[in-house]
Amino acid sequence: MPDLHTLPAGSRPERAIRNNGPSDLALERYKLRELAEGWPCYRDACEWENLRSIFHPDAHIYTTWTGLTHHLQFIEASKTGMDNGVFIMHRIHGSTTDIDPSGVRAVTKMKATITQRFSGLPCVSGGTCEADAESDCRFIFFWEKLDGSEYPELDQQWRARFVRHWYEKDKLIAVTAGRDPVIDLEKLQQYPPGYRHLAYLQESTMGVKVLLDLPGHRREGSTVNGQKHDLFQEYPMLHGCNSYKDNRGFPTTLKSIALREIRMKYLFDVI
């Protein structure tokens, strides 16, 4: 078991404002909480226009079933999935925000549970049954307050440039007591503990290939998921998301960067 209580050096940006601070920045943090909580509230209710209003026009996100994708592609994939019977909901538990002193960059960490209903599963007692796979996560939002130079209509609006999830703990719940789904336990163990049942059933029922190297909890230690949590590597600094882009127009260094590193660099090195 890794040392869970000594966080990696630099994991807490010393110049970030959080918890109290100036009233004007507290108001900005409140705005960011409202935006972050909009993801699950708007997506689950199919309020697509409201969901789009959270993101920068060139924002990208990462999920188990889409991988790295543009937010508009994620919305279209969500619509298609819903039309095909995919039933994903979210529960919000709380959030914190680190904001830079100038009030133009911020990072929000939102605790939430992703819960997906799977129907028509083979049942241990015969027939079929339903089950909910749930993963407790941290949604990490990287915000920029736009100055209107590129998008005048968005002047002084906060928009998410990038969103990624840390998958920390999951479980499988039978919808009806005594009606448990048949599980291939050997295959199940091939998936990461933070989203094991979710990944197992997404691959089994949705025809997708789930990414297996997404960030997990620190207790996962030397596994790829534990390493992604604490990954430390050198990379070009993010500068307005306009440099160091790959062939999909996205900064290559954001694909697997550590939370502690990107928080510090995003908040301060580009100011």
UniProtKB/Swiss-Prot annotation:
Superkingdom: Eukaryota
UniProt source species: Aspergillus terreus (strain NIH 2624 / FGSC A1156)
Spans annotated as Disordered: 1-20
One Pfam family in the UniProt entry: SnoaL_4
Parts of the chain that traverse the membrane: none
Official protein name in the record: Uncharacterized protein ATEG_07673.1
Record-stated family: Belongs to the PEP2 family.
